[in-house]
Design a protein with these regions (language model features):
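Bacterial Sec-dependent N-terminal signal peptides
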Residues: 1-21
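Mature N-terminal segment immediately following signal peptide/propeptide cleavage
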Residues: 20-61
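Carbohydrate-binding surfaces of carbohydrate-active enzymes
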Residues: 32, 43, 47-48, 61, ...
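Acidic/aromatic-lined carbohydrate-recognition and catalytic surfaces
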Residues: 67-175, 184, 193-197, 204-206, ...
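An acidic-aromatic loop/edge-strand motif
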Residues: 111-121, 126-142, 146-159, 163-166, ...
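Extended acidic/polar, glycine-enriched regions
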Residues: 150-155, 159-237, 713-753, 853-855
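C-terminal structured "cap/appendage" subdomains that terminate the fold
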Residues: 546-547, 562, 570-573, 603-613, ...
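Aromatic-lined ligand-binding clefts that engage carbohydrates, nucleic acids, or primary amines
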Residues: 688, 805-831, 838, 858-862
Length: 920
């Protein structure tokens, strides 16, 4: 562990090491990918081949996740954790070390954790309640067997409770139940008898690989979890295999697992009362306040058990073997902040395509809306920031579009969204291992994106990978510098949401926390950034020199309590102590009104009322009021903009006035930003920074260009000149001292007249399947699907557009080649020299250095998507869906062929211009 955490500390010092330059690139800064091992049917030669292809393209890490296999290939499958499988893991680790790729692995196959070693005793568990109404005053005999037949062999009787509502009696009859029958001389009156059986969900591992099939484990049971990891201990020890760099856990998709054998004992110890004495209220369909409070206590207990018995134990186990953990907490029935914070690398997930209305970005009807907006993505990064974790990772581009239709240009906006949300260690979802000899399209995972050498976008993916690497090299440097902490009102959610087991999945968050989501976007639109904080982290936060310092060592200017109804007394009391110690506390819409939960309610309410009396008296939250509170200040009001302004925190004008999105981090000499224009308009103006600066550097992560920015002082604040087209991004680094001997940033001024290159083009194909031979005089730069060749509408290809042009004698500092609408990425050569790769809007490259007087040969190698080819294969009935279990589905998870797909435009698809520019 010392080696890994030493590197973590180096990240924080990175800014002083690499001032004015691009940071040195480490493997963690490069993009990584989930590496699907289909059937674990891998061999040494093809593992080496795949890894070398990944490294050559620019990947820095793989995460092995074994899944279901390929039809007719069972003889080559390697059972998970078998000696043969471990031998291939050893080979992978050795090859990864040789070529500079970090090797992670899933702590299981498919998802969730489980498999053949999970006994029925250790399998995921559920509560089964049954009710019987009886009249007392006589001997009662009841058959208590479980009604659900499949539960009878496995369910165990935990409690038999009797309740008399008239005299409020509660009797524990468990000891009177023998052999599935209750014999009881019932006192007079009407009795409600409730039995609790501990049953099983019978859920099995989804998409399991050979050797990984079996029941999902009970994540809430400490012993079951420990026994699960013991199988890994045994396999690694017996096969003398090194443990991987990181162990991974996918999103929590354990369904219906709402109990564990010792739950009632754990509940009583943690909540201070016996849940079995309140079964009628707990299972009631009508949700009164008592039921809501008891259910809230149940949900908090589930959260505690999941964090302590699963994620914390898993992380401690990994640390014991010199590894770290990476976890997706979303989907779990636990406080997401505390769950994410209990592991080493919190990981968020994108699911679908975001719509930013970026100018010129290709549109595709076969997409689904991204369910992970900024508010969802920030759960993982918030936990990382407040807990002092250096990395936030992401499962990236899951179901961005249908298979075979995802372009690099569509990836960039959602990648930028993740960056501004705090991600700095991305993983593609994903890359299937595919043998070199496999027939195209090779081995595929059922869900997109397919970032692999068998996908045509791999041709120009290295340019995209380099973009990610440059961005992450900065985003891993220094420390987070968000403005506010925002209290996560989890007790309001636990109290208000229907049902009992409450899962915080990506797709349900709009229902789980609509008010909180609105708050997050409001704060962001006011020009600020924030991290969420849980009750546990509030209680460990200190005030140092007027700043809030979290347990992880990250500082914030104030904390926002957003319209919270329920709050534990310890949390409110600590907030008041922070205010007394010079902190700024902002309450919006109302003060907390009550304590959560049911146990010792009246006593806790009395203590809470005493704390409420210490809050400043406020006539109405309609008016924003800042009240001094000993050394600190308490701000109240309904209007976020007004309340946040009174905190004295300076908003970012680039967000409020110009609509840009950004994230800011700090380093020893200042700050650095990642900025993206995720909107229809661009920016070309002086922008006021929220932080002071004596000098500013700009870094273009698309090209590697860098230079000292133009700055000026306006009313004591630093302004920097910024130019961004719609969809573009830039890294901005500030310094507390004046930079000297640094090249200036080149600001572009387009001249009013451009050179149209709309005629004289020829087209041939560097590679194409099915093959297209010869050269075509197409004249205008148009989609090759329109040329007179039977294979043109169906080929997967790299087409080369060639033209000979004469550059006019126009005084210019440089020339920009504007490729217009490119389908989908283009490598440009001018006079035989590589002039760069255009893979995202606005598809422009600076090319002046390669132009010469007289004739100039321009070659544009455009690579399309594989959609046209795969659709043709489906129309011809060619079998390529050769996978077990789920066998490549569409966005709606239906096995629909692509026979109806119309040809997608391919190649250059519009005007090409050469624009003379002046640098200012």
């Amino acid at each position: 562990m010392k080696r890994k955490y030493l590197f973590f500390s180096l990240l924080l010092a990175g800014s002083s090491l690499y001032a004015q330059e691009w940071p040195a690139v480490r493997p963690e800064a490069r993009p990584a990918t989930r590496w699907w091992w289909l059937g674990s049917a891998v061999d040494a030669a093809n593992l080496t081949y795949n890894l070398e292809e990944y490294a050559k393209a620019g990947l820095g890490g793989v995460e092995i996740t074994p899944i279901y296999g390929v039809q007719g290939n069972d003889k080559n499958n390697l059972p998970f954790l078998s000696p043969q499988w471990m031998n291939m893991l050893q080979h992978t680790e050795a090859e990864g070390k040789r070529i500079g790729i970090e090797v992670d692995m899933n702590t299981g196959t498919g998802w969730p954790f489980g498999g053949p070693h999970v006994s029925m005793t250790d399998a995921a568990t559920k509560a089964i309640f049954q009710s019987y109404q009886v009249e007392g005053g006589k001997e009662i005999t009841l058959d208590l067997k479980v009604e659900e037949e499949k539960q009878r062999p496995v369910a165990t009787l935990s409690r038999v409770m009797a309740y008399n509502a008239d005299n409020k009696q509660c009797l524990n009859l468990t000891s009177k139940a023998k052999n599935g029958q209750l014999q009881w001389k019932a006192p007079a009156g009407h009795w409600n008898i409730i039995t609790l059986y501990i049953g099983k969900t019978f859920q099995k591992v989804k998409r399991a690989a050979p050797g990984g099939e079996g029941y999902v484990m009970n994540h809430l049971d400490k012993g079951a979890v420990k026994r699960y990891f013991a199988n890994f201990d045994k396999a690694f020890k017996e096969n003398k295999t090194n443990f991987p760099h990181t162990f991974f856990n996918d999103s929590y998709e354990v369904y219906g697992a709402d109990w564990t054998p010792d739950f009632l004992e754990q509940f009583a110890r943690r909540r201070g009362y016996k849940l079995e004495e309140h079964f009628p209220e707990f299972i009631a369909q009508d949700r009164n306040e008592t039921t809501a409070r008891i259910v809230s206590d149940y949900r908090e207990t589930i959260s505690d058990l999941l964090i302590e018995n699963f994620s914390t134990q898993w992380t401690n186990w990994a640390h014991g073997h010199g590894s770290i953990t990476r976890n997706q907490a979303h989907g779990s029935p636990a406080n997401l902040i505390d769950t994410y914070a209990s592991v080493d690398i919190p990981e968020c997930e994108g699911f679908g395509l975001s719509q930013f209305h970026i100018k010129g970005l290709r549109q595709d009807s076969l997409t689904r809306k991204n369910d992970s907006d900024l508010s969802m993505l920030k759960y993982a990064s918030s936990a990382a920031h407040i807990a002092g974790k250096p990395y936030t990772s992401s499962e990236t581009f899951t179901w961005l579009t249908e298979h075979f239709r995802t372009s690099l240009s569509q990836c960039k906006p959602d990648m930028d969204l993740m960056f501004v949300s705090g991600v700095n260690h991305m993983f593609f979802h994903g890359t299937p291992y595919s043998p070199k000899e496999a027939k195209w399209p090779g081995w595929k995972f059922y869900a997109s994106i397919d970032m692999s050498p068998t996908n045509n976008i791999w041709q120009d993916a290295p340019a995209f990978f380099e973009y990610i690497t440059r961005c992450q090299s900065f985003l891993q440097m220094g420390k987070p510098d968000n403005d506010f902490l925002v209290y996560l009102p989890v007790y309001d959610m636990w109290q208000e949401q229907p049902g009992r087991l409450l899962l915080f999945s990506i797709h349900d968050m709009a229902k789980r926390a609509p008010k909180f989501i609105e708050t997050v976007h409001t704060i962001s639109n006011c020009g600020y950034d924030m991290d969420y904080i849980s009750d546990n982290f509030v209680k460990s936060t200190r005030c140092v020199n007027g700043k809030l310092l979290t347990k992880g060592g990250t500082s914030y200017k104030a904390i926002i309590i957003p319209a919270v109804k329920l709050m534990p007394s310890e949390v409110l009391g600590h907030l008041l102590k922070l205010a007394q110690a010079e902190a700024t506390i902002i309450f919006t819409e109302n003060y907390p009104q009550d304590v959560p939960g049911y146990g010792k309610l009246e006593a806790r309410r009395k203590g809470f009322a005493q704390l409420q009396k210490q809050l400043p008296e406020v006539a109405s939250f309609n008016e924003t009021v800042a009240t001094p509170y000993q050394k600190g200040i308490i701000i109240t009001g309904n209007n976020y903009q007004s309340a946040l302004e009174k905190s004295g925190v300076v908003p970012e004008e680039m967000k409020t006035r110009y609509g840009l999105q950004c994230i800011r981090r700090s380093h020893a000499d200042g700050h650095h930003y990642f900025i993206s224009s995720l909107q229809e308009k661009g920016v070309n103006d002086w922008i006021t920074l929220a932080v002071p600066a004596e000098s500013v550097m700009l870094f273009n992560p698309m090209t590697g260009e860098k230079g000292k920015a133009q700055t000026r002082k306006q009313e004591g604040k630093t302004q920097v000149r910024l130019q961004l087209h719609s969809g573009e991004s830039v890294i901005l680094q500030t310094f507390n001292h004046i930079l000297t001997d640094v090249a200036e940033w080149k600001y572009v001024q387009e001249q009013p007249v451009s050179l149209s290159l709309d005629h004289g083009w020829k087209l041939h194909f560097a590679k194409s399947t099915p093959r297209i031979e010869g050269t075509f005089d197409i004249d205008t730069p148009s989609s090759w699907t329109e040329i007179a060749h039977p294979n043109a509408p169906i080929t997967m290809a790299t087409g080369v557009y060639t033209n000979i042009i004469t550059v006019p004698h126009i005084p210019a500092d440089d020339w920009i080649l504007d490729l217009g609408d490119v389908r989908e990425s283009a490598r440009v050569r001018i006079n035989g020299q590589d002039a760069g790769t255009a893979w995202a809007v606005p598809y422009q490259l600076k090319v002046g250095k390669w132009l010469k007087p007289g004739d100039n040969k321009i070659e544009i190698e455009v690579t399309n998507l594989p959609a046209n080819r795969i659709a043709d294969m489906d129309r011809r009935g060619e079998k390529w869906r050769i996978f077990n279990e789920i066998n490549v589905v569409n966005l709606q998870y239906k096995p629909i062929p692509y026979t109806d797909w119309q040809p997608l435009p391919s190649g250059l698809n519009g005007s090409v211009r050469l624009i003379p520019v002046t640098y200012k």
